[in-house]
Amino acid sequence: MVKAQNAVSIATDLSVLRSLSEGQRFTAIGQTVQAQYHFTPKEAGYAWVSYYSPGKYKNTLTATAKDPLTTPAAMNYMASSELRFRQISLGWKHYFKGAYDSEDPFNIYGTAGFGLLFSKVQNTHSQAIDTAVYIKPMQSVAGSDDFRRLTFDLALGTELKLGAGIYFYTELRTWLPASSNPAPHLFDKYTPQVAMLNGGIRILFD
């Protein structure tokens, strides 16, 4: 008897991302492209690439005078920021209900993995502050920066069978920071803190 080969799926989706980080709340639109290798009917490994449109947000910051006799003693200014995410992730997929090739109309699954987040942030300040006279906050430094962070990636999803080997899926995802690398251009050092709603198509090659 010849043993059947394990199956492969290719999937793509549209994603709405909401950043929940303090001082960095924004919404962005993105896409994920992924491959899945099905080891058993309920277990699979995945690899995905995702990218998002820039998210924009603003914060009012205060620079304080070094000398208490300076007038004014403090100056407020606006930091306008743009933050963009790209990510690759490797992980595991488990079906709680159904299977990758289930004939049932409805599947439920979860995923867990580790990712590498590539981010670019750019900050513009509403006015120039003389740093010889005033002390500026450490966060949201003017200029741009690229940074990387490890993430712990979780998702809960459902699938609806549309036809032979074609499934429509929806997922709730999140990325949690798995490494600490303070970036002075960010307002929140615990970036990313995000929630995503994804919807797309998975095609099975059996």
Q: What is the predicted function of each stretch?
A:
Residues V8, T27-Q31, E82-I88, F106, ...:
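Residues that define the transmembrane beta-barrel architecture of outer-membrane proteins
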Residues S9-V16, A65-A74, D130-M138, L176-P182:
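Flexible, solvent-exposed coil segments and beta strand-coil junctions
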Residues L17-S21, A73-S80, K97, M138-S144, ...:
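Extracellular loop and loop/strand-boundary signature of outer-membrane beta-barrel proteins
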Residues M1-A7, D206:
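Cleavable N-terminal export/targeting peptides
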Residues S15-S21, P54-K56, K97-A99, L117-V121, ...:
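Sequence/structural signature of outer-membrane beta-barrel proteins
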Residues Y37-T131, N198-D206:
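Gram-negative (and chloroplast) outer-membrane scaffold detector with strong preference
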Residues G55-T60, N76, L154-D206:
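Predominantly the C-terminal beta-signal and adjacent terminal strand-loop region
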Residues T12, V16, V33-Y37, L90-H94, ...:
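Residues on the lipid-exposed face of transmembrane beta-strands in outer-membrane beta-barrel proteins
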